[in-house]
Amino acid sequence: MSLGLIGRKVGMTRIFTDEGESVPVTVLEVVPNRVTQIKTAASDGYTSLQVAYGERRASRIGKALAGHYAKAGVSAGAGIKEFPVSDDVLANYSVGGQITVELFQPGQLVDVTGTSLGKGFSGAIKRHNFSSNRASHGNSRSHNVPGSIGMAQDPGRVFPGKRMPGHLGAVKTTVQNLEIVRVDAERNLLLIKGAVPGSKGGDVVVRPSVKVKA
């Protein structure tokens, strides 16, 4: 995997190109991610870069985590995340260093991961994109229901994983191949074309695309 950044979704707006075209963009605020630990194959069995992202008051950090931040010489963050990377990438960073929005360039394609909007309890039609039943002609009170979920006497049970009504949304979601329209290093902002998962203020992970369009 490649190195990415963790930021916060600010919201959506639009910008105009030099030709006057309106482009919808999502604004992400990416406070510089601080390197808290470098893991190598010799010491940890794998290579990865551990970073702290966001900001949090020191009074809200437990002693163990506060000591971890102090050892790295970085300010307290809202959380910690690891990016599995190669030895070549590790060589470019040191503990206590920063990774800024300049990791990305305008025009680059990225994958954005966040927690999708929660939509509460939903039926099987909406939740799993089932087809509705007939509106009339013999259908009585079975218009928008999933139908039978049962089996015969053998096996006599409902198999695990059966798609049923339940909570919709609030799950980890990735949108691939989104284009970075603008990088504002002065204000720590990324402007990404289109929509990204999650609500305003939600954490998102931005990585270089793994399925780059030909």
Swiss-Prot record:
GO biological process, one term: translation
Keyword Cell cycle: no
Keyword Cell membrane: no
GO molecular function: rRNA binding; structural constituent of ribosome
Cross-referenced Gene3D superfamilies: 3.30.160.810, Translation factors
Residues making up the signal peptide according to the UniProt record: none
GO (cellular component) term, any one: cytosolic large ribosomal subunit
Modified sites of kind N5-methylglutamine: 153
Taxonomy, superkingdom: Bacteria
Subunit structure as annotated in this protein's UniProt entry: Part of the 50S ribosomal subunit. Forms a cluster with proteins L14 and L19.
Function description: One of the primary rRNA binding proteins, it binds directly near the 3'-end of the 23S rRNA, where it nucleates assembly of the 50S subunit.
Protein name according to UniProt: Large ribosomal subunit protein uL3
Organism per entry: Methylobacillus flagellatus (strain ATCC 51484 / DSM 6875 / VKM B-1610 / KT)
Gene field: rplC
